[in-house]
Amino acid sequence: FTTNTFTDKEWGYGDESPKVFAPTAFDADQIVRTAEEAGMTGLILTCKHHDGFCLWPSKFTEHSVKNSPWRNGKDDVVREISNACKEYQIGFGIYLSPWDRNHAEYGRPAYLEYFRNQLHELTTEYGELFEVWFDGANGGDGYYGGANELRRIDRKTYYDWENTREIVRRNQPNAVMFSDAGPDVRWVGNE
């Protein structure tokens, strides 16, 4: 549920206008209530996928709901889902892609500060999280602020996982982390 919902793409390129994000019947209560009625004990929201579009009004990018027509850019999908999870007493988790096909600095050292700032926002502003999910992210082709090029990284070293994971441990000590780099749950290659 992101700009891709409105562009009919599996993965966005990062050049999608926030203006395409215009859900007309979004109802966090209905989504979480349905999950709870189905017997689920937790829900993980994809807060930002590889296209870089943020479902919360991040202070660090313009590529987010704050520049969409949805509720005049004044609302926050992450907050609504988080609040509904609290109401229905089911765990709330976040998915944050390390790869960002929209950001001009992706693949360079400066991007890490941006990524960690977003991780800090998500791990401090939405209550207790039961899981933080980092997808595998090797880079690839993308918009990258208009560069429209291929960028590859060494996923084992680029994200400096030891220090990045420390943000989660400090802000959400009880959260389980999923990523290719561990430490709690790793991808086993069966997607």
PLM feature spans:
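Mature catalytic domains of secreted/periplasmic carbohydrate-active enzymes
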Residues: 1-191
